[in-house]
UniProtKB/Swiss-Prot annotation:
Similarity remark: Belongs to the universal ribosomal protein uS2 family.
GO CC, alphabetical: cytosolic small ribosomal subunit
GO biological process: translation
This protein's UniProt keywords: Ribonucleoprotein, Ribosomal protein
Pfam families the UniProt entry points to: Ribosomal_S2 (PF00318)
Protein name: Small ribosomal subunit protein uS2
One term of GO molecular function: structural constituent of ribosome
Cystine residue pairs: none
InterPro entries, per database record: Ribosomal_uS2, Ribosomal_uS2_bac/mit/plastid, Ribosomal_uS2_CS, Ribosomal_uS2_flav_dom_sf
Length: 274
């Protein structure tokens, strides 16, 4: 079953590109034609390329990596936050701070400061300060939360970026390119697809189009997380079964001249005492 259908794409208006005077020639291969001065995107290409992107995202998250959702334009902000939270990923939906990837250590210091302020509010220690200073600290916390709240728990660089509007988020894309972080993105008719590892040709301005594609990318993340959990559970069960099968009193000796270790099965030992 296809992860996204032509009908869904048409209903969401994903096929509408920009005006014909605003386009990037590199997008020519993804354009079906023009109507009333508007480019029409070839949705057959969109379906195929989205399937490829979906598989990549699923595999990335399934291997233990995270995807950073990026979309700061007004039409994308709510969707980016909602869908990233739904699938347990990180997001930036207000402002991309330069160096967020390439200077991650410095950004991490600001995130640590946000956590420090959160802790002060939670335990009430912020109330020890004068009223004026409390207002300053709360203002600092609000600003940090607005810009960095979506990556508060991101301990390391993401395994991939998902971007809405690569023109607007060009700094994010270039930083990812520089670090070799794969980018999945909606590419409208005015975008440069060469900068994107997994382009999804489509309308990056309409709210319905953004929501449809972003929700499907979030579905891919959720599927990847399920696969990861299943793999981890299977590995755990395998280790537990192997431990149970070790005969009581079996002696294992390392090939090196280390100590001899006796593996004792406590269940079997208890049965013998009875």
């Amino acid at each position: 079953m296809a992860v996204i259908s032509m009908k869904q794409l048409l209903e969401a208006g994903v096929h509408f590109g920009h005006q014909t005077r605003r386009w990037n020639p590199k997008m020519k291969t993804y354009i079906f034609g023009a109507r009333n001065g508007i480019y029409i995107i070839d949705l057959q290409r969109t379906v195929r390329l989205f399937h490829t992107a979906y598989q990549f995202v699923t595999q990335t998250v399934g291997s233990g990596e995270h995807v950073l959702f990026v979309g700061t334009k007004q039409q994308a902000r709510d969707t980016i936050a909602e869908e990233a939270q739904r699938c347990g990923m990180y997001y930036i939906n207000q402002r991309w701070l330069g160096g967020m990837l390439t200077n991650f250590k410095t950004i991490k210091l600001r995130v640590d400061r946000l956590k420090e302020l959160d802790a002060m509010v939670e335990d009430g220690s912020i109330n020890r300060f004068p009223k004026k200073e409390i207002l300053q600290l709360m203002g600092e916390r609000e600003k940090l939360e607005k810009n960095l709240g979506g990556i508060k728990n991101m301990a390391r660089l993401p395994g991939a970026l998902y971007v809405v509007d690569t023109q607007r988020e060009n700094i994010a894309v270039l930083e990812a390119n520089r670090l070799g972080i794969p980018v999945v993105a909606i590419v409208d008719t005015n975008c440069d697809p060469d900068l994107i590892n997994y382009p999804i040709p489509g309308n990056d301005d309409a709210i319905r189009a953004i929501r449809l594609i972003t929700s499907k990318v979030a579905d891919a993340c959720a599927e990847g997380r399920r696969r990861l959990e299943e793999t981890e559970q299977a590995d755990h069960d395998k280790e537990f079964t192997a431990l149970e099968e070790v005969p009581a009193g079996q002696i294992l000796k390392d090939e090196a001249s280390g100590p001899i270790v006796e593996i004792v099965n406590p269940v079997a030992e208890a049965e013998e005492e009875q």
